[in-house]
Amino acid sequence: MDLGEKINTVERLVIDASRVSRYLGYPRKVPIWKLEFNLPKTCYIFRENNNSDIAIDIENMMGFAIVPALSEKEAHNRLKTLIPSIYIKDKIERL
């Protein structure tokens, strides 16, 4: 099993999304969701092709993610595959 990359969530970490153009094109536009979350001091991130379109910003064990997904539940599940140890702290917002 791949352990992913260990990150220190106290320091600032910004990961930009890639491959976003496939979600923004006509005829079907995928909704974009903003999720705010808390993290432990150190955790693992599992960046792969199927979640490289997720952007995250982390600092002081808190952060937010911008996730393209068809539903709120799918957005939550996609973020959990990227960072399994997250705790969603607020309502998920559709942008």
Model-identified regions with their sequence ranges:
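Short, mixed-charge low-complexity intrinsically disordered segments
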Residues: 2-23, 64, 72, 76-95
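Short glycine-aromatic motifs
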Residues: 43, 54, 86-87
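A short, exposed loop/beta-hairpin motif centered on an aromatic-Gly-Thr core
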Residues: 49-50, 54-73
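Short N-terminal "domain-start" leader segments
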Residues: 2-50
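Hydrophobic beta-strand residues in large extracellular and virion-surface proteins
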Residues: 33-35, 45, 67-69, 75, ...
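A structural detector for beta-sheet-dominated domains
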Residues: 36-38, 59, 70, 93
